[in-house]
Regions:
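DNA/chromatin major-groove-contacting recognition/catalytic segments
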Residues: 144-151, 244, 265, 269-285
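Short, polar N-cap/turn motifs at the start of nucleic acid-interacting alpha helices
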Residues: 125-132, 246-266
Length: 285
């Protein structure tokens, strides 16, 4: 449906006209955001060229999203509930073949790092005395994990120092210990200096990790009806911290998001659910 009249002179377009266009435009959210950005830039240019005195597009707002049941279900599928997490980790820890995968998965649940950041951690990045880990890089997949080439993190916000919980310290120390054992007992072990590695010393690949958790899920009596990838453990931390009233800014700082739509969605969803539970409790008093 075409609602923006391109024959209009730019000085005749006001904020109400642009607002009506945004409200009536039948487009996806991403397209609507793009249209708004184009309008902002167009009218900014017109102001700079002195065709108009101010930018009406800046006063118009994107219409609020109306959440559907499908939207809610999609958000809930981005993180694991406590019982789902326990069942999956128990299965990963059950066999030697996936034990290392279980340790890495649990570490990400507590730390919130991306898998590329986790497998780039070296012992020298960890300060056990101060209980912190320095997230300063990710592994470059283009040259292959076996070469262990470390590059910078995804964004400036991703470059961070993260406090370590008791469980994270236990996991890191256990991984370092089993790596030492592998190094002394396996001829194939290639010591590339990373913590989260396979029994042969190569950093755990994202694809291998995802396949392992997918197969572990399939072995469960009641498989989890969610798309399981390494991201779900990071998102699970966001939901757990939100449930425990951690500020959004603090959560974003820990997981390394400068501005994440997914983090916001999960945080908003969980806190809204908590508000609803409070109302149910009050109604039952």
């Amino acid at each position: 449906k075409k609602v923006f009249d391109l024959s209009l002179r730019i000085r005749n377009v006001d904020a109400k006209y642009i607002q009506r266009f945004l409200n009536e435009c039948e487009a996806s959210r991403s397209k609507l955001e793009r249209y708004k950005m184009i309008l902002n830039l167009t009218f900014d240019y017109s102001v700079n060229m002195e065709y108009i005195s101010d930018n009406p597009a800046r006063r118009a707002k994107l219409p609020k999203l109306v959440k559907t049941l499908d939207d809610i279900e999609k958000t809930e599928k981005k993180f694991l509930e406590p019982d789902e997490l326990k069942r999956l980790l128990d299965e990963l820890y059950r066999t030697d073949k996936t034990y290392r995968i279980g340790l890495l998965a649990e570490f990400m649940v507590y730390n919130g790092c991306r898998i590329g950041e986790a497998i780039a951690i070296k012992p020298e990045n960890i300060d056990f005395d101060k209980k912190v880990v320095h997230i300063h890089g990710t592994l470059d997949k283009t040259v292959g994990y076996a070469k262990g080439l470390k590059t910078t993190t995804k964004t400036v916000a991703s470059f961070r120092t993260v406090s370590l919980s008791k469980r994270e310290i236990e996991i890191l120390k256990e991984f370092i210990k089993i790596n030492e054992l592998s190094k002394n007992t396996r001829k194939e072990f290639a010591d590339l200096g990373f913590v989260f590695v396979t029994k042969n010393g190569v950093p755990i690949q994202n694809n291998s990790f995802n396949l392992a958790i997918k197969r572990a899920n399939e072995r469960l009596d009641e498989p989890i009806d969610k798309h399981l990838t390494s991201h779900i453990f990071r998102h699970t931390l966001v939901s757990r911290l939100a449930e425990n009233n951690a500020p959004l800014k603090a959560i974003m700082s820990r997981v390394g998001h400068s501005d994440s739509r997914t983090t916001n969605k999960i945080y908003t969803h969980v806190t809204k659910k908590m508000d609803d539970n409070i109302l149910d409790l009050l109604d039952s008093l």
